Amino acid sequence: MNDDLIYKIKEKKEILKDKITILAHHYQNIEIVKLSDVIGDSYKLAVEGSRSKSEFIVFCGVKFMAEGAAILAKDTQKIVIPDMKAGCPMAEMIDAIRAKEVYERIREGCNKEVAPVVYVNSYGDMKNFCGERGGATCTSSNAKKILEYYFNQGKRVFFSPDYNLGINTAKSLNLKK
């Protein structure tokens, strides 16, 4: 980031004062972090954005993170993402249209109810897809508990999009292929 851009951002922050809050994910470069009001993971940033009294929330992260912040934001807040091309390869592995196709195929081949579970680092359409079908979102730290919950109800699970998290969680539960 060049000095001119840094100066312009500082200038706008000074003009807008409490009307703007800049949120930055941990992985942002140091120049952005220094300009930010809050630094954290996607969940912390979404929550802190919603707690802010600012009208404008600038979310320095990827699209699904800004989308999560927008879900929690007050009606009076506008979430802005500086780079609309800032995507997450994992979140883009599947969308609700493809998930529905796969989910239906799994249901057809299964003699049990299927609960969709999506890793929280996903777009809103996937989270909505899960909620509409009695599923859930999970984090890497609670994936095992979420899967156990559905398995204890006698259900099967359709897990996406984090393949490795799904496989490693299945192994930790001693599930067969």
Model-derived segments and their meaning:
Residues M1-K177:
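The feature marks the mature, well-folded catalytic cores of soluble enzymes
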